[in-house]
């Protein structure tokens, strides 16, 4: 997980909480995938002049919806129910930081949105890794290992475009600041059966 450079790793005991309510983690996970697809489409809508970004984020949005479907299939197969969409306090805190960090220019808006997206993908990827290595459920362990690889690719996509289109912005410095901020935020989580909880 070194490439993601997260400051605060997830305590593996979080998986013990998850295992007590598989329906809750799967429901939360399904909605995380839906929100990730919606986020990618929002970036496309606001930055349609960047043909390469549009092409790659269309593919990413489709993949996120495919993941939503995969999670929903697991829910159905297990006789569980997809609950209502959950509020994600972790993501909301990152979104507030993104808004505060935007200096008002289009370039800054795009870079901050891309770094926000990369941060969520990086943490999700790390959580999937922890799940795959610690959950006592062979099907879910395999599923989360496969998703982990996909999410790492998404993280890379967002960071790559932040670097490419962040003209006049020290993207590496901003990314380090994002990582430091995220560590403070995630320190308050890890005790709920949700992907970022």
Roles of regions detected by a PLM:
Residues 1-197:
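Non-heme di-metal
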